[in-house]
């Protein structure tokens, strides 16, 4: 155990952690030069296209240090986007140290601050690394000063590297060996292993990535999953180098994969503890906190026959994505589907993209909404993630919305624009700190305002320089109403939205105008109305197409023409009573693009 080092890399999006990982793998001889490709650990095609890391990945590498000893480096790559912060907390729980990678040209950004605090809270040794020093705009001294001012850790010994050119990567490895402590033995000698991640393999069943805290796991031993109480027989164990390599055992302090022929998707929950069935550990490891989904949306198959396939696909994704929640839902407008919970809009986009690509599903998604708390008149509090499930208003005492604390880091030039944006979004300012060349702005904002398009607007008002990190604070009561959309007098449940009362008229008007452009013309007038309760607040009409029934009458008696027009009017009236209006997918997305 003395020569094992477990570490992860934390950084903001685009500060170069996957490239640094590539260089570390190359220098330790994990892959031959011909097998190397850029971002070797970002294995998912969506990760490679968007240039972001979504899933944490792990590699075990042997490294011969300058003192002649061979060290085993277990390295877990982590994502940088705020939506995937739960992946980071999970990876950090399995490590003793972390490399904090900061772009020397851009300086400290909000997500690296948040992840660094998580690492310090978990008692990890943080080693600062300044990347991209080959750029002409890199300023190492300023970046060091920012790390000390914004994060508050000593950056005097920060290693300055260029991951792209490979400069000083050997110094990073020496810093890992000498500054990150080895795993400490636990107070029990019984097997305890933390499940960091699980995924489904078509041939092997469930494969789990584990960090062995104490004891050892061998093929043939019977393990117990502590939360479910089920036992499984271990088939194979091994490590990633980054290729999958089988071993005879995984010992204390090591990070590797195990395959215990678990065929059930929920057999190895992430964050759970494994122990030996014959000689179990007295208690489970303190896992990381369960992430609560913050954004909910309905996912419905375009073809109703795909419903079982969608359920199976979500089950498999859930194994690999601990924060995804879903439950069956039926909608009058859309048929059968699932109500899914996500961590944020990027998470939602990526889940939908993975379902469509990896499982060949054609999906419709409804407008995303946050979770509100509803206090009923009988004193009970219920969570509400679907506007159409709001109880009748005479049973509702108050509606509470989720409030978040946002930390924004920005250059001083854009402070005015950002404050204006936050005020527009009903924010209340907590404080402003000037830290060297950066300004830290803290705001309390309603989550509903942040989730949809706040991130995009923040980037545009600051020309891409501001960065955002947020965490949930509390629920606050407010004057909220539900705006329903009626098409020809029928309520469309999938288009209901919850808004602040002061915005209801404007949102209703915008929604009606948007829908008018999107619903195709029929042979009869289509009335689109927005209503709060029984009061109609806005209306627009899609005019009917008209067939010229008088075309065949050349001159002649006017009563003949009247008769034909009356007949047409009767037919339209009858058609309107039985006619159904098809609502296209774009109409459901119109709710999203209201402010644009």
Swiss-Prot record:
Keywords: Cell inner membrane, Cell membrane, GTP-binding, Hydrolase, Membrane, Nucleotide-binding, Protein biosynthesis. SUPFAM superfamilies: EF-G C-terminal domain-like, P-loop containing nucleoside triphosphate hydrolases, Translation proteins. GTP binds at residues 14-19, 131-134. GO terms for molecular function: GTP binding; GTPase activity; guanosine tetraphosphate binding; ribosome binding; translation elongation factor activity. PROSITE patterns: G_TR_1 (PS00301), G_TR_2 (PS51722). It comes from the Bacteria. Residues 2-184 form the tr-type G domain. It is a peripheral membrane protein. One of its GO terms (biological process) is positive regulation of translation. Its main location: membrane. It catalyses: GTP + H2O = GDP + phosphate + H(+). One of its GO terms (cellular component) is plasma membrane. Belongs to the TRAFAC class translation factor GTPase superfamily. Classic translation factor GTPase family. LepA subfamily. Required for accurate and efficient protein synthesis under certain stress conditions. May act as a fidelity factor of the translation reaction, by catalyzing a one-codon backward translocation of tRNAs on improperly translocated ribosomes. Back-translocation proceeds from a post-translocation (POST) complex to a pre-translocation (PRE) complex, thus giving elongation factor G a second chance to translocate the tRNAs correctly. Binds to ribosomes in a GTP-dependent manner. NCBIfam families: lepA, small_GTP. PANTHER family: TRANSLATION FACTOR GUF1 HOMOLOG, CHLOROPLASTIC (PTHR43512:SF4), TRANSLATION FACTOR GUF1-RELATED (PTHR43512). This is Elongation factor 4. It comes from Xanthomonas oryzae pv. oryzae (strain PXO99A).
